[in-house]
Amino acid sequence: MAVWQAASGKVYLPPSTPVARVQSTDEYVQRTNIYYHAYSDRLLTVGHPYFNIYDIQGTKIKVPKVSGNQHRVFRLKLPDPNRFALADMSVYNPDKERLVWGCRGIEIGRGQPLGVGSVGHPLFNKLGDTENPNSYKGNSTDDRQNVSFDPKQLQMFIIGCAPCLGEHWDRALPCADDVPNPGSCPPIELKNTAIQDGDMADIGYGNLNFKALQENRADVSLDIVNETCKYPDFLKMQNDVYGDSCFFYARREQCYARHFFVRGGKTGDDIPAGQIDEGSMKNAFYIPPVNNQAQNNLGNSMYFPTVSGSLVSSDAQLFNRPFWLQRAQGHNNGICWFNQLFVTVVDNTRNTNFSISVHSENTDVSKIQNYDSQKFQEYLRHVEEYEISLILQLCKVPLTAEVLAQINAMNSNILEEWQLGFVPAPDNPIHDTYRYINSAATRCPDKNPPKEREDPYKDLNFWNVDLSERLSLELDQYSLGRKFLFQAGLQQATVNGTKTVSSKLSTRGVKRKRKQ
């Protein structure tokens, strides 16, 4: 960025050398009047709401973890528009242009009824209630209780052509000359990582690596006690120079403190009031009680609330409604580079957990004589239901020197995917072909086959949704397509066999003046 800096502390001077300016995609991408509708199947997933269930060996997952407090990250794979056999070949010149997709609208459909979920821990670190205490309670060896609560209410989705960037606090390495004492609090740092499918969202206890920073395994609920809660780094994505991770987003969060508790255990940071003799902090925070009082055994000061998401209502839903993209927050105005789109979703307003009970002896219900709770196996399951619809606009990128330089500086892999300047070598008229190439009598096959371009996100976990054969030009045949045509005042027409969209023009006549 070109910024002015103070030379001697008094005068601000302009940048000494010109700095390359990042262009918006609107400056070099040409949009056509051809629109496609893309839609997914009904996307379903079922699992346990708190943890993975493994087999006896503990190596294979029998039932995956599926929680309403997880991020769902859909990686939508779109077809390559440059391979489309367009009926109207005047749309673009393949020798001078390349086709890309532009996202103009999206609707994230959610099934299942609204419901409030409950999370908790059978051994939760809760010493006592500090909102309305009736006696002074001190610490013991184990004060854990069976506590449950409803999480913070969260609805959010983020649209981009790159994975959403998340942030969380994690354990940091201490300085080399600073040897920490046993039991001392470790330093922490803010880390940025991509949000993957299945990563836990913040449910009211912050974006923290609980697995590394809460060794008692009792300070939070079961669904996050061994996890890392992430939160989208909106500040960093909004200031991204290209804006690929977040075209736009919608967010709705709400919570309130329902109960106020205090932690059990030994306080690591003592209240500064215990100096010997007449220290500078003596009686600064509290005055010591007499020896025969229960208050003489000072209680903990590790206070915390249990949050609640409160009312769940259909009046404040972000889903099952269309969103239109006119202007993105960054320089990328909805262009889907590499023919893919990332949709990051969190919605815990449909957070009902199913309780399933099975008789341990598989006895018919009509033959059970007396109720015995120990003869029933109780199970928990959570289900998620999604459906995604898109409005895609066909766009052209001119292959000029200025545009190619801009794209190469942004991501050179885009040009490699377009195969610019690729001229195949002349074919040798005679090749050697072995019949039994894998036998011991012939030479080994080629050990260095041509490498395909590696997926930069191969190590990340996403819900892959293939839309390569789910596109249609018949916008008026789909719900989102009809909404798009109506809200924009457009109508469809067929030009040279290709469906195009044009504006509706008013043909209202001019009112004649009345003769005097």
From Swiss-Prot:
<keyword id="KW-1048">Host nucleus</keyword>
<dbReference type="InterPro" id="IPR011222">
    <property type="entry name" value="dsDNA_vir_gr_I_capsid"/>
</dbReference>
<keyword id="KW-1164">Virus endocytosis by host</keyword>
<dbReference type="InterPro" id="IPR002210">
    <property type="entry name" value="Capsid_L1_Papillomavir"/>
</dbReference>
<dbReference type="GO" id="GO:0019062">
    <property type="term" value="P:virion attachment to host cell"/>
</dbReference>
<keyword id="KW-0946">Virion</keyword>
<dbReference type="Pfam" id="PF00500">
    <property type="entry name" value="Late_protein_L1"/>
</dbReference>
<keyword id="KW-1015">Disulfide bond</keyword>
<keyword id="KW-1161">Viral attachment to host cell</keyword>
<comment type="similarity">
    <text>Belongs to the papillomaviridae L1 protein family.</text>
</comment>
<dbReference type="GO" id="GO:0039620">
    <property type="term" value="C:T=7 icosahedral viral capsid"/>
</dbReference>
<keyword id="KW-0945">Host-virus interaction</keyword>
<keyword id="KW-0426">Late protein</keyword>
<keyword id="KW-1145">T=7 icosahedral capsid protein</keyword>
<keyword id="KW-1160">Virus entry into host cell</keyword>
<dbReference type="GO" id="GO:0005198">
    <property type="term" value="F:structural molecule activity"/>
</dbReference>
<comment type="subunit">
    <text>Self-assembles into homopentamers. The capsid has an icosahedral symmetry and consists of 72 capsomers, with each capsomer being a pentamer of L1. Interacts with the minor capsid protein L2; this interaction is necessary for viral genome encapsidation. Interacts with protein E2; this interaction enhances E2-dependent replication and transcription activation.</text>
</comment>
<dbReference type="GO" id="GO:0042025">
    <property type="term" value="C:host cell nucleus"/>
</dbReference>
<comment type="function">
    <text>Forms an icosahedral capsid with a T=7 symmetry and a 50 nm diameter. The capsid is composed of 72 pentamers linked to each other by disulfide bonds and associated with L2 proteins. Binds to heparan sulfate proteoglycans on cell surface of basal layer keratinocytes to provide initial virion attachment. This binding mediates a conformational change in the virus capsid that facilitates efficient infection. The virion enters the host cell via endocytosis. During virus trafficking, L1 protein dissociates from the viral DNA and the genomic DNA is released to the host nucleus.</text>
</comment>
<keyword id="KW-1162">Viral penetration into host cytoplasm</keyword>
<protein>
    <recommendedName>
        <fullName>Major capsid protein L1</fullName>
    </recommendedName>
</protein>
<keyword id="KW-0167">Capsid protein</keyword>
<dbReference type="InterPro" id="IPR036973">
    <property type="entry name" value="Capsid_L1_sf_Papillomavir"/>
</dbReference>
<dbReference type="GO" id="GO:0075509">
    <property type="term" value="P:endocytosis involved in viral entry into host cell"/>
</dbReference>
